[in-house]
């Protein structure tokens, strides 16, 4: 993340195509070290691409990802107390535990595809 943040800072500073040295100097200015492998990967993936278009494409992809917020079942409303009313039985639900797959970690898409 810090490599991406440094890259974006360079772009915001007016450098439309930051180099590895540009990103490294930004990271070193705050006492952070650059991971060479991640830096080279980032630079190769963003080579000849407009960062605003990359961000727009990312937003579009994220808009298609479900973010939870599903309906919540609150159950039936409580019955008015009556003399002969039997207590409502509670239905027990079993929760299935699903194993998390590797592809679930990136929510089904790569940052640079």
UniProtKB/Swiss-Prot annotation:
One of its GO terms (molecular function) is protein-containing complex binding. Coiled coil: none annotated. The keyword Phosphoprotein applies. It comes from Zea mays. Residues 89-99 have a biased composition (Basic and acidic residues). P1 and P2 exist as dimers at the large ribosomal subunit. GO terms for biological process: cytoplasmic translational elongation. This is Large ribosomal subunit protein P2B. The gene is RPP2B.
């Amino acid at each position: 993340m810090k490599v991406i943040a440094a890259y974006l800072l360079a772009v915001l500073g007016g450098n439309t195509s930051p180099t590895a040295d540009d990103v490294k100097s930004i990271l070193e200015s705050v006492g952070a070290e650059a991971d060479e492998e991640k830096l080279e990967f980032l630079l190769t993936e963003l080579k000849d691409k407009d960062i605003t278009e990359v961000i727009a494409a990312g937003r579009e992809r994220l808009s298609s990802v479900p973010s939870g917020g599903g309906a919540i079942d609150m159950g039936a409303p409580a019955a008015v107390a009556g003399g002969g009313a039997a207590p409502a039985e509670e239905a027990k639900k079993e929760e299935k535990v699903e194993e998390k797959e590797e592809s679930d970690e990136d929510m089904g898409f790569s940052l640079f595809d």
